[in-house]
A protein has these predicted regions:
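Conserved beta-strand termini and adjacent loop/short-helix elements that scaffold enzyme active sites
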Residues: 1, 72-74, 201
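Beta-strand elements within well-structured catalytic alpha/beta cores of enzymes
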Residues: 1-2, 42, 148-154
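Glycine-rich phosphate-binding loop signature in dinucleotide/nucleotide-binding domains
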Residues: 34-37, 142-147
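Loop-to-helix element that buttresses phosphate recognition and phosphoryl-transfer chemistry
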Residues: 4-55, 127-132
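Phosphate-coordination/substrate-recognition cap region in phosphate-metabolizing enzymes
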Residues: 28-107
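Active-site metal-binding loops of divalent metal-dependent hydrolases
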Residues: 4, 156, 202-204
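Acidic, low-complexity terminal tails and accessory targeting/binding regions
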Residues: 76-100, 129, 144-149, 164-219
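Short glycine/proline- and acidic residue-enriched helix-loop micro-motifs
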Residues: 93-130
Length: 219
């Protein structure tokens, strides 16, 4: 699943907004109502991802440490600022208007395309080949070692990359998958000895009610 809404436009993006906390708790409450249980949890090392798991656990009515928990940077998001700097090295104003917001994501789209095709290398980031390999390794490890239900709390880039691996999508399609993943949305995979299969993508069943319509966010 993707983390709840983070603090886009703030000095510190890597923390949940108030709505992000509510989205996460609501997902946990939804799963508790459905009797959903997990045998293991794998989370990236980013603060917003770990706060999302804390909110889910609260909604489930359990302690975050009550389940086997592993943290791995392989589930971390790419550095969007580093990606943008490969195509626009000059500082950008804060994306606090619709026009600047669109410009930010136009640049990000171009930078992602170049990174994924091996035409640009953002400073401080792995190559996209290595980024994708890290995600594949997490999925392969689950196949080998984790019977039962495993919850992965990650971000849009890794989730889109995982789906792209399964569907063998080209770079542009993977970017579109990335940009359309909503906060706290669930993507479900099944796994067998032969590998993984995509069951559902980007679902928000926990927000499928009139009182939660304004809880649906992309950033």
């Amino acid at each position: 699943m993707r983390h709840g809404q983070a603090s886009f436009g703030a000095d510190d993006y890597d923390r949940l907004s108030d709505l992000g906390w509510r989205q996460s708790r609501r997902l946990g409450e939804y799963w508790r109502g459905k009797g959903q249980q997990f045998d293991r949890v794998i989370v990236g090392t980013l603060r917003r991802q770990n706060e999302t798991w804390q909110g889910i656990a609260e909604g489930l009515g359990i302690s975050p440490g009550s389940l086997p928990l592993m943290q791995t940077p392989s589930l971390n998001e790419y550095d969007s600022h580093a990606v943008i700097r490969t195509v626009h090295p000059d500082p950008l104003p804060k994306a606090d208007t619709p026009e600047l917001y669109r410009h930010h994501f136009q640049l990000l789209r171009v930078g992602l395309q170049a990174w994924m095709q091996g035409q640009a290398q953002p400073v401080g980031m792995p190559t996209y080949v290595d980024f994708r390999a890290g995600i594949a390794a997490v999925l392969d490890d689950i196949c080998r070692t984790s019977p039962g239900r495993v919850l992965l709390v990650s971000s849009g880039g890794p989730i889109a990359t995982a789906v792209g691996l399964l569907l063998q999508t080209p770079a542009q399609a993977t970017i579109e998958l990335n940009f359309h993943i909503r906060n706290s949305a669930v993507t479900e995979l099944s796994y067998r000895a032969k590998g993984h299969r995509l069951i559902s993508y980007n679902t928000l069943n926990h927000l499928d009610s009139p009182q939660h319509q304004d809880w649906v966010t992309f950033t």
